[in-house]
Amino acid sequence: MNSPSPFGQNEWLVEEMYRKFREDPSSVDPSWHEFLVDYSPEPTNDAPAGNGKPAAAPTAPPEPASAPAPKPASTNGGAPPAKADTSTTRAPEKKPEEKTSPAPKAKTAAPAGVSDDDETQVLRGAAAAVVKNMSASLDVPTATSVRAIPAKAMIDNRIVINNHLKRTRGGKISFTHLLGYAIVQAVKKFPNMNRHFAEIDGKPVAVTPAHTNLGLAIDLPGKDGKRSLVVAAIKNCETMHFGQFIAAYEDIVRRARDGKLTAEDFAGVTISLTNPGTIGTVHSVPRLMKGQGAIVGAGAMEYPAEFQGASEERIAELGVGKLMTLTSTYDHRIIQGAESGDFLRTIHTLLLDDEFYDEIFRELGIPHEPVRWRIDNPDSIEDKNARVIELIAAYRNRGHLMADIDPLRLDKTRFRSHPDLDVNTHGLTLWDLDREFKVNGFAGKTHKKLRDILGLLRDAYCRHIGVEYTHILEPEQQQWLQERIEVKHEKPTVAEQKYILSKLNAAEAFETFLQTKYVGQKRFSLEGAETVIPMMDAAIDQCAEHGLDEVVIGMPHRGRLNVLANIVGKPYSQIFTEFEGNLNPSQAHGSGDVKYHLGANGTYIQMFGDNDIDVSLVANPSHLEAVDPVLEGLVRAKQDILDKGNGPDGFTVVPMMLHGDAAFAGQGVVAETLNLALLRGYRTGGTIHIIVNNQIGFTTSPYDSRSSEYCTDVAKMIGAPIFHVNGDDPEACVWVAKLAVDFRQKFKKDVVIDMLCYRRRGHNEGDDPSMTQPTMYDVIDTKRGVRKSYTEALIGRGDISMKEAEDALRDYQGQLERVFNEVRELEKHAIAPSSSVESDQMVPAGMSTAVDKSLLARIGDAHLGYPDDFNVHPRVKPVLEKRREMAYEGKVDWAFAELLALGTFLAEGKTIRFTGQDTRRGTFTQRHSVIIDRQTGREFTPLDLLTVDSDGNPTGGKFMAYDSALSEFAAVGFEYGYSVGNPNALVLWEAQFGDFVNGAQSIIDEFISSGEAKWGQLSDVVLLLPHGHEGQGPDHTSGRIERFLLLWAEGSMTIAMPSTPANYFHLLRRHGLDGIHRPLIVFTPKSMLRNKAAVSDLKDFTEMKFRSVLEEPTYTEGTGDRSKAKRILLTSGKLYYELAARKSKEGRDDVAILRLEQLAPLPKRRLAATLDEYPNAEQYFWVQEEPANQGAWPTLGLTLPEVLPEKLAGIKRISRRAMSAPSSGSSKVHAVEQQEIIDEAFG
């Protein structure tokens, strides 16, 4: 059966159920109630899911009172007779002539020509009515116009239409649908064709009916095998658009075949259509019944007789198309031949007309342009072959611009098109569709018809998936994608379709419950984008199919709760407990966080396979996309632990990242993170990016939020393939997800899926989006959800039975009930203030960080352990030699002390990751952790020699030093994530200058300083921030000590500014060995790197440990007298050396200088004990280089008097004045200010 209905051949059953539901809901299976409550039986004008409420097919209005005209007979003898439509003039009913019945005869003589052996049958019922009507039709003086019409445009457009319907909602459009609609449109131009003749008061009258009622001649087989013909009317056709016309047409045909037509259906036919062409008749002159003005007969579509023996190739070469003969048989009393001829010419024009098919395509929701009628182009086949190749390339490049990827279709007046995708632009026409062209291996063929080429290209690039991949530079990757995209579409199995439907059921049931139970609470629902659940499920399933180890998900807050429940498997009861605000006291350390920021872990088990895979969702803040680099770092850490390499079997932990469309285009960290994708220090073997594109950012429309065509354009920078997919087509989304994983596995690169959908509610559940997007939300408010539209499509295409649909509906209701049942069992906890996390991790007592002198010697030797044929740069070689000397003789500088600390860790089997801009050499040419061959460029890393012991056995240690991209936000986020993923590694990131760390402020605020308190997420990442006032200007001076101290609380991190190489050594050693997982912020020196006073003896490494407060060496060595000190200068960092030089120069025994090496947590007891060593101190000053409103003073000025009120209640500050910038831009001004600080300190 032909039907554009969403339910195809099953539409009648659904509509019958809907009718019963309207009359008595209890008469319909309860599983259908929720589905039918907002069901509209008319077809929508969208695919795959309708927008807005579909318009109902109009019903005939009450007919004005008038006397009936004479009853005409049905077309071609159809029974029962049709009734004339109303007119403005009353026509009195004619009284039938009285007839007297003849007396019965004993036997009737056989008619002439009938022998006694012939079989005779008395015609009764419908057959008798045919005889009567045919006889009556002899009284109608008719004439017939005949016109041969090219059928090619209609044939080709019907192919396009039905291919679209087959892929979307099912059903077919017949030629009679198109022809009937063209007749109705032609009648509007020639209304006289809709008139009929009558006699009123004995006078001839031309009756013009109020409406066009098109009579369809329907051939019906009887139970006895005989055929009968009925003519039923489609009423009020002139008021219908194409979708309504098809619905009314199919309703009449279906009821005729089911024997459910009523007398009203036969009444009022004004013009008829009969199509004997369906049985091969080429030319027909049907009889015209009384009460009608015309009947149109359609013949079979055939090639002209002289070409019917030609081959298909020859016909295509000559440009010969099929013809259809139309006849118009009309009542010559009221219609003239010219009118009938013009009427047929109009139908002819319509069936070739662009606008006619444009309307039909729009009504059926076909998003691209129809086949256009054009004159054949006489160019040679060779010229056209080149154009076909160009056309294929155009579709590969720009096919996505014509893809039907927007489920809302807000602009229904515009076809998705592009000049490059128009065959006419390439000098090709519909006459070329059946011609063969060389295609150079396209779809695995050497030659293909243009029709097949176009069909495959549109299926591949222009349906519900738009693909961008031609920006990829590697031909192998392009070819791999083409081989999988340019193939015949294969539907999922029924089992897979049911599984997809079950995931949609779960997604919608979850959101429905939350909306019902927690009205108005913020949850950032997934409604409108539920397809992301089966999409993610499919991607994870494919990862399991490849035998991978884990999928780690990072995502924003929208849809997060649904993902936690339906992907990660977090129990409903736990999620709803968080909704109730009932935090478990045993877990409520720190501040906690809102429910849609929390993470979880689970295991995914395949539905159609035997594998399982770990799945985790990382915690995130509301700072959109800030989690991106954190996820990548965490995954890299897990991969490094597994250590499966970079080959085909490597990268077995998969990062899956969800984004919003506005954020993906708008947040710079997206580009920063993408830029890391292929760098050796940051590769994770490809990320699966899924953009939940609801086409709005809070209240901002796409045209206000990005300059690019797509939100995904930024991903082209790394050569990632991009798939745009319609979120209302779950099967397409699932197919793309699997392909994305396969591509990632093959090429170890990122893949981007842009799933276009919508947001059913506002940005949050308390927001009203219609204030700013009224048109969009008018569409959304009446749009059926994807679960229902997918169910319709499955039934309409015949993929599942009505019984299976009922089972799916019961599954949905069962899942909803399951959620309701779980929430009744919620565990209740009393609410109490949250406790601090500070005491959760304590420094172990008696921990030693000293090392044996022999180990220091090994590290020194390693710096001269390069191969004999290695060409060390002449400026680097003296540095390496000096380091070996320091390892044996002392006077260790800062850079070598750092390498000694790292070397000892490697010897102890620890993994070290050290990154940053210019980190391997060092911004200040101080580190040289990796040596480059002056001639060949090969690398030598001295510390790698410490990963084996003196006997050559591996220690298990790894040293990974990388120069990072020029990024702070993504780079710091990555290292934080790495430290979370591998808590046993020592992870260091160094800023080029400390000033630039503010580029990573979101990571510092949201993760480093508060991740433990909010999520219980532990990290011991180390930030090294070069800091110090040296006259280099405001942007090369300050690591912003004040900001870190402001963020510090609850022991959230350690903030230090060591002043000696040995103390820095012990600080790093303590951090790596104490078992406390909290970030370490170190403000490192610049000019002090080469200060000859800033060196340490070997015994400081072999006998000491980290000291949070340092006195001057003269006091600790016993040469100074503490009792003489009356003025105590507290300071930190490199300023100490300037103060010490001034003291030494002036011999000021009355001044003592104390260094606070650890700024937070404040070493209160050690500081108090040290101050007690100076019994005669009278004045206390905090001396800093930084302006008064910066550095440590804004915090210490408040804290020191509180913690040590006996001594420091009156502590004063010595510093630069308060400044908005960190320093002066003039080196001369700097020198003056610096001198003033020193002078005031000793005043």
UniProtKB/Swiss-Prot annotation:
Q: Which residues form a coiled coil?
A: 799-831
- Segments carrying the region annotation (Disordered) are 22-118
**Example GO biological process term?**
tricarboxylic acid cycle
Activity regulation (record text): Alpha-ketoglutarate dehydrogenase and decarboxylase activities are inhibited by unphosphorylated GarA, and allosterically activated by acetyl-CoA, the main substrate of the TCA cycle.
Q: Which residues form the active site?
A: H332
What the record says about family reads: Belongs to the 2-oxoacid dehydrogenase family. Kgd subfamily.
Q: What is this protein called?
A: Multifunctional 2-oxoglutarate metabolism enzyme
User: From what organism does this protein derive?
Assistant: Mycolicibacterium vanbaalenii (strain DSM 7251 / JCM 13017 / BCRC 16820 / KCTC 9966 / NRRL B-24157 / PYR-1) (Mycobacterium vanbaalenii)
Gene label: kgd
